[in-house]
Structure formats: structure tokens, C-alpha cells
């Protein structure tokens, strides 16, 4: 991998991690289209530390408030006393499913499920689910019922959105896509679903990135070029990811996710056509 390729993949990661279009799919598809080598599951997980940094930078006030409230609640023996403390525990609860499924299906995630056929199916499948979730929101609003805010996320919402996040272990599904979809099915507002999705990503993405960094440390440090490429890709993904978060939260205040549904459908269908004609290999 050249430095240019690493920077380009960092841009792809930053652009697609938070938009509901799947960063893993694009990190697999873009190199295939350009004739580059597959960066692999480890590279993908490690540069997600960059987008993790983007979440930390964007939500640093929220994160400090949540962590502080959780600690105060524990010390006072009232862990759910404040909304901020409750949110901390909701994030923890929502993280449990992806940890369990990630450990159970780690080998399949890193091998079989990285096939472009799986990715094309996931792109199309989640587009259909997201369209159903949008229909649910419109139906809910047409009945004159308000959508839920961050303060109204409880154990049920946290665990179900956490289960939805587990689907993101399938490349092409999109972690933000499945969690936002889950949130919409549970009648969260689009902005609330996205905001909770981003905060929920912190523990899982951090754990996956650190694990892959530890597992591949010898390979990374074997060449200065490897270190430079990973550093460049991670830094780039952090900067671009920050801008992507700001864009999506602003966009969802006034718009639906229709544009992303259409994009996923077109990308999935195009990918299937390229595979069927032999232009791309799975």
C-alpha cells in the first residue's frame, strides 16, 4: 500500500463511517475498483480509531458530562439519578450485544463475510429496512405522536439498538445505518437516532481498534512504511469523520434518509452487476 492509497482510504473511512452507507463496504469496493490490494479487516478496524477520535472531538462535552455523572451516581449509590448518568448506562447496555456476537463470529467476519456478494446483499438489504423505518416514522408522526428524544431512551431502546448494532458486523450493513434504522423503528427522531448511534460507537470501535492494533503490532512495526500509512489513514479519517458527523446531524434535522436509501440500492445493484460480468472478483 502506498501513502497515497492510505490517505485516500482514510478519506473514504471518514466520509462513510458516519453516513449510513457502510465504511467497510467502501473500503472493500474502492480498492477493488482501482486495482489496489484489499486493505483487510485489521486495517479497517485500526483506522476506525481515527473516526473514534472524531466522535470524541465532536461530543467531548457530552462525554465528559456523561462519565462524570456516572461516577457521581456510583459514588452516591444512585447510578440512574440523572439523565446524563442514565445515558452512560444505556450506552454500556447497548454495547453488550456487539461484544457477544463479535467474539462468537470473529472468524467469519474477517473472512467469509468480506465477500463482495455479502456486501452487495447487505447494501440492498439495509436500504429496504431503512425505507421501512422511514415509513414507520411517517406513520407515527401522521398520528400526531411526538418522536422520542435522548432523555427518553431507556433499557429497551438501548438493548434493541445494541442488537441492531450487531448486524453491523456484516460488512456492507453500516454500523451507523443499522443503529439509526433501529432508532427509527423505535420512534426516535432522526437526529436523536444518529446522536445515540455515534455515542454508542465509542466502546465497540475503541475495543475493535485496540484489539486489531495489538494483534497486528509486529506486522505494523516491521516496516516504517506500514506505520506511516496507518498514521496517515487514521489522521485523515479523523478530520473527515468530524466533518461528516457535523454534516449528518445538521442534515437529519430537516431531511429524511431517502438519499442514503437510494445510494445504497444503486451501489448494491451496481456491485452485483460488476460481479456478474466478472469486472470485479468477489
Swiss-Prot record:
It comes from the Bacteria. Keywords: Antibiotic resistance, Cell inner membrane, Cell membrane, Cell shape, Cell wall biogenesis/degradation, Hydrolase, Membrane, Peptidoglycan synthesis, Transmembrane, Transmembrane helix. GO terms for cellular component: plasma membrane. The gene is uppP. This is Undecaprenyl-diphosphatase. It is found in: Cell inner membrane. It catalyses: di-trans,octa-cis-undecaprenyl diphosphate + H2O = di-trans,octa-cis-undecaprenyl phosphate + phosphate + H(+). GO terms for molecular function: undecaprenyl-diphosphatase activity.
Amino acid at each position: 500500500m502506498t501513502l497515497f492509497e492510505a490517505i485516500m482510504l482514510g478519506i473514504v473511512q471518514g466520509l462513510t463511517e458516519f453516513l449510513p452507507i457502510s465504511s467497510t463496504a467502501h473500503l472493500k469496493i474502492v480498492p477493488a475498483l482501482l486495482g489496489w490490494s484489499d486493505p483487510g479487516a485489521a486495517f479497517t478496524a485500526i483506522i476506525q480509531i481515527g473516526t473514534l477520535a472524531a466522535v470524541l472531538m465532536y461530543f467531548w462535552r457530552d462525554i465528559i458530562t456523561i462519565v462524570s455523572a456516572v461516577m457521581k451516581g456510583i459514588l452516591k449509590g444512585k447510578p440512574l439519578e440523572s439523565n446524563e448518568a442514565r445515558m452512560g448506562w444505556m450506552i454500556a447496555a447497548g454495547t453488550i450485544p456487539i461484544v457477544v456476537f463479535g467474539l462468537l463470529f470473529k472468524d467469519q467476519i474477517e473472512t467469509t463475510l468480506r465477500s463482495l456478494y455479502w456486501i452487495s446483499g447487505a447494501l440492498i438489504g439495509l436500504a429496504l429496512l431503512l425505507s421501512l423505518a422511514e415509513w414507520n416514522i411517517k406513520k407515527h408522526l401522521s398520528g400526531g405522536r411526538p418522536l422520542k428524544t435522548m432523555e427518553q431512551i431507556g433499557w429497551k431502546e438501548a438493548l434493541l439498538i445494541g442488537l441492531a448494532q450487531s448486524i453491523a458486523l456484516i460488512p456492507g450493513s453500516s454500523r451507523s445505518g443499522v443503529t439509526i434504522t433501529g432508532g427509527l423503528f423505535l420512534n426516535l427522531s432522526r437526529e436523536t437516532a444518529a446522536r445515540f448511534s455515534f455515542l454508542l460507537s465509542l466502546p465497540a470501535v475503541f475495543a475493535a481498534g485496540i484489539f486489531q492494533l495489538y494483534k497486528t503490532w509486529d506486522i505494523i512495526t516491521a516496516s516504517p512504511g506500514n506505520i506511516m500509512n496507518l498514521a496517515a489513514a487514521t489522521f485523515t479519517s479523523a478530520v473527515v469523520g468530524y466533518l461528516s458527523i457535523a454534516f449528518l446531524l445538521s442534515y437529519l434535522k430537516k431531511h429524511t434518509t431517502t438519499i442514503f436509501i437510494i445510494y445504497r440500492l444503486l451501489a448494491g445493484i451496481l456491485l452485483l452487476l460488476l460481479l456478474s460480468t466478472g469486472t470485479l472478483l468477489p
